[in-house]
Amino acid sequence: LSLHDALPIWILDELYPQGFKHNEQSLRVVDVLENLNLTWETRDGIVNHSGTNMASTLEGQIVKFADRIAYVNHDIDDAKRAGLISDNELPESCVNVLGTTSQSRINTMVSDIIYSSKDKNIISMSESVYKAMWDLRQFMFDHVYLASRAKNEEIKAGSIIKWLYYYFLENTLELPDEFKCMLLKSGNERVICDYIAGMTDRYATNKFKELFLPETLS
């Protein structure tokens, strides 16, 4: 799990002068950081797996739906474990269409995609299932992502990213070797974004403790 899944990666968009976009970073990872020789179709699927643009291939369109399905169900499970929501709070209209459990929701959406896309040259969902999925996503925004408790945690996480960003901006020689060697070609701020964006939430938290907290407090 890296920062685009866990910590508020949009903070980097505020910090980095050229802006930071998750899908563009995903493409940079395979093109630059990993130096992979991928096909145009694969790269198109990566850069269009999020956002409003549609991938050019059926495979890429499937990935985009799969990402949305996994995202909303994963976050519901996490929110329930954290005590932020309960099953009874999920919108009845969504439950009636998608089901009551994570397994049933995933099965409904995947089956609907298969049925709705059969014999077509585009991957799609039926209107009712698509609406239920987006209504569920909106519910998560209203009750989890923007809720006070989650927002407070996001503020804390954002502060960690800022501290790390500015620290390494002033101490580039402390970057791992695989990032230091990129400084001259890509520039300090770009490389620091690469480093932070690849961190897991646990790694970022531990790095913050290592750099800023006395050993007895970390």
Language model features: what each stretch is:
Residues 10-16:
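Active-/binding-site microenvironments in catalytic and ligand-binding cores
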Residues 2-7:
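Short, small-residue-biased leader/transition segments that mark boundaries at the very start
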Residues 1, 16, 50:
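Acidic, glycine-rich active-site loops and adjacent beta-strand->loop/helix elements
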Residues 20-218:
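Histidine-centered, transition-metal-coordinating active-site segments
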